[in-house]
């Protein structure tokens, strides 16, 4: 849906024709992940409501424009009756967009390395139990590429505090222990390094069944897609932006995993990743996938272009 909405939440040339017809939006949870969704919520021609059966600690009346609704009856009254064919049109657009994304991911992987978006798509698609998502770029990659799982008991967890990076390794271990099921954690390298101490399991503690899939692009990728990326293009600014925002680290993740007694595997292609995540092993593993930060904007642009190419000349929007 973020790709269907376009950059301006449905009010730009990149948006699917359906997006401009949106009249009401119901918000579930805090919308901090996607700028396109925030742009949609800010559209003056769109009425918005927040479904809040219990008080939301982040929502202060008067500071956001959504109207709080508590009951399903209030929600139904706000939503009203959709036009015939409206839901089917969105479902059709979504299926076409999903197919376009998956086809584009296959064609955009660069030789002997996977793109970060492909790692996110494959890892999430393999979920048969709990999935823990790291913050920053990783969770946004899943947001763009994930096909909802067929497993009815799939669960997704994420730390969404100030930045969400704190304690993610320990969160994943806690989820695995609490749920009693093999858990997959998809993390960026900085998220993994920020709490490397979470890999420590004392001799009297229970080891979780946990796969840590680490997208290692040697630094922080999120800033290149924000305003900082434009700053880097100015004369003399590329090096300081890379040092202060890219923060390359050069850490040997295999050596780090060995120090904590965690088996390490380097994954180089899609087949290896699928095979590794299908292997019913016990205990913990660190699956390292080395990526290039330069691939991220290239692949993101290719995904957006692929979805735009699926827009029919005339969209089947109900009159």
Q: What is each model feature region?
A:
Residues 26-31, 51-54, 133-137, 187-188, ...:
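Structural motif
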């Amino acid at each position: 849906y973020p790709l269907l909405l376009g950059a301006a939440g449905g009010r730009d040339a990149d948006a699917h024709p359906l997006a401009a017809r949106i009249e009401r939006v119901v918000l579930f949870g805090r919308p901090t992940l996607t700028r396109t969704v925030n742009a949609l919520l800010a559209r003056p021609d769109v009425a918005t409501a927040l479904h809040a059966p219990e008080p939301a600690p982040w929502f202060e009346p008067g500071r956001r424009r959504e109207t709080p609704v508590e009951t399903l009856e209030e929600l139904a009254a706000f939503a009203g009756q959709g036009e015939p064919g409206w839901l089917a049109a969105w479902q059709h657009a979504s299926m076409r967009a999903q197919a376009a994304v998956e086809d584009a991911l296959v064609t955009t992987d660069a030789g002997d390395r996977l793109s970060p978006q492909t790692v996110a798509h494959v890892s999430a698609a393999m979920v048969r139990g709990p999935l823990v998502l790291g913050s920053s770029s990783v969770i946004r990659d899943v947001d763009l590429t994930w096909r909802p799982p067929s497993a009815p008991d799939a669960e997704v967890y994420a730390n969404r505090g100030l930045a969400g990076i704190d304690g993610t390794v320990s969160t994943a271990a806690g989820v695995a222990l609490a749920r009693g099921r093999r858990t997959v954690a998809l993390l960026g390298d900085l998220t993994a390094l920020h709490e490397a101490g979470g890999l420590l399991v004392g001799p009297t503690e229970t080891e979780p069944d946990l796969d840590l899939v680490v997208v290692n692009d040697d630094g922080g990728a999120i800033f290149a897609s924000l305003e900082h990326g434009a700053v880097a293009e100015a004369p003399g600014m590329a090096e300081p932006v890379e040092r202060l925002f890219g923060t390359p680290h050069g850490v040997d993740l295999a050596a780090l995993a060995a120090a904590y007694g965690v088996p390490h595997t380097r994954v180089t292609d899609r087949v290896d990743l699928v095979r590794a995540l299908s292997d019913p092993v016990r205990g913990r593993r660190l699956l390292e996938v080395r990526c290039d930060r330069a691939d991220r904007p290239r692949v993101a642009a290719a995904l957006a272009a692929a979805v735009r190419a699926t827009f029919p000349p005339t969209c089947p929007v109900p009159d």
